[in-house]
């Protein structure tokens, strides 16, 4: 029996099934079409194999599916479980579509395609077991970073192309390639997912007629309904490349009709700062005539890929701030790191990629950009507070949860010696930093040797504990004092972290400014994150203006992330509402201060 036949009795959810690190591109937190008829079981049992999966933490949801981390009860291997209630899947065409999605996806196995492990059903639910992509998708990366550096774009695009080459060799057209369907694992490898709109080409020259895709990435031949084939994926990759380098999609407008009109007219412009070689490849892929576009198998031979530096790996830190390409690729390894290698002189200079290459965008957040993030956050908090989220007849706080917005970095511990030296802190990745009273900053990475030094004017330098100038000896000694104090008094001793390939490109966000009130300490990181630790009950807020989200850590140390706009819609408990009101006042204080480069005076 073939896969489609096996899956035939399964009801099918729409193509926009869940998100949050699993295939599917529905917006997490979107309203569910109808209440779940049954509660999702704690243990999922495959009736055929009797294999059991234990349901873990919530990952996200879409219109018809909820997604959870699940683990094999025997092997303890962890997967993403996409769970679709049958009560919402009653129409015959939904059954057909799910059968097709499962049939296509389970036939695929490639390094850059989300792994398909299992599917089964019980009387109430359909369960799909997929590879877990812990680092979410390129959509979250885009929201945090906007435009990427050119080496990063090459790194991601090369993997997208390799995955798509595999699909096309197997006669599969994805038809919905976009940032939200390009997932990232712990090693920041791209995994193509969500095959809800995918189709199989049955014979050479077949042209599909179905109108499908996502507005910003949809090819003109799909809109014209004249028939389409593999070329639509190349068009989508062109849109993705533009978005990664420019920071927004090429045809995006606030009006769907206008977006479609621009696509049909091929009306877009490439900013002047984009490398001409990159601009040329974008133009080749975004040609109205599908036959004029390069095939997926020709793309990697383009000069953009053959002449430019492609990192072998990228550090996790680049999910939130640009990596450093401060030395030539031939010496990009930890052993060749020069002491006090200057990355960036001044806050507005662009990060160099490699000698003779111009690189955009600006590497470090300018003061204007940081103030813009704070302004956005103030507006977001003003809006949610004005809605009086705790004063509802029915508060559905759980509907606002969106784990895809979980912060990459936050302050896990801190110690205040500002009367003499400064504020010491530890980030969640076990790196340790000090914001000194002279407004300089020193960060020790979690490998215990690599150091990042930021001067008052924003110049970033890189050195090591074993190789540094004498002028920094005192600060390194103080940093070690802070580190030892936090290890002994505040932290559990952690195992040494083995350096991974790509870590030599890491740059960490640093503590930009902080202040204390009677109630809390307020910490503002250089990546835009604002953290508030409340003294009395040890609750915490971690606010991200780029994701428009808040993470709330309650007295029990439960860690939940919500989209602010959804809290506005669904409401929240009084405890969270009062802290959001307080947060708005603190962000206003951060924004109005003129001395935001170091410690603010507490009121």
Swiss-Prot record:
Pfam family, one: Pkinase
Region (Important for interaction with phosphorylated proteins): 538-540
Post-translational modification: Catalytic activity is enhanced by phosphorylation of Thr-210. Phosphorylation at Thr-210 is first detected on centrosomes in the G2 phase of the cell cycle, peaks in prometaphase and gradually disappears from centrosomes during anaphase. Dephosphorylation at Thr-210 at centrosomes is probably mediated by protein phosphatase 1C (PP1C), via interaction with PPP1R12A/MYPT1. Autophosphorylation and phosphorylation of Ser-137 may not be significant for the activation of PLK1 during mitosis, but may enhance catalytic activity during recovery after DNA damage checkpoint. Ubiquitinated by the anaphase promoting complex/cyclosome (APC/C) in anaphase and following DNA damage, leading to its degradation by the proteasome. Ubiquitination is mediated via its interaction with FZR1/CDH1. Ubiquitination and subsequent degradation prevents entry into mitosis and is essential to maintain an efficient G2 DNA damage checkpoint.
Region described as Activation loop: 194-221
Modified residues (Phosphoserine): 103, 137, 269, 335, 375, 450
Effect noted on mutating residue 538 to A: Abolishes interaction with NEDD9
Consequence when changing residue 206 to D: No change in activity
Tissue and organ expression note: Newborn and adult spleen, fetal and newborn kidney, liver, brain, thymus and adult bone marrow, thymus, ovary and testes.
Annotated family: Belongs to the protein kinase superfamily. Ser/Thr protein kinase family. CDC5/Polo subfamily.
Domain notes: The POLO box domains act as phosphopeptide-binding module that recognizes and binds serine-[phosphothreonine/phosphoserine]-(proline/X) motifs. PLK1 recognizes and binds docking proteins that are already phosphorylated on these motifs, and then phosphorylates them. PLK1 can also create its own docking sites by mediating phosphorylation of serine-[phosphothreonine/phosphoserine]-(proline/X) motifs subsequently recognized by the POLO box domains.
Protein name as it appears in the record: Serine/threonine-protein kinase PLK1
Source organism: Mus musculus
Origin organism lineage: Eukaryota, Metazoa, Chordata, Craniata, Vertebrata
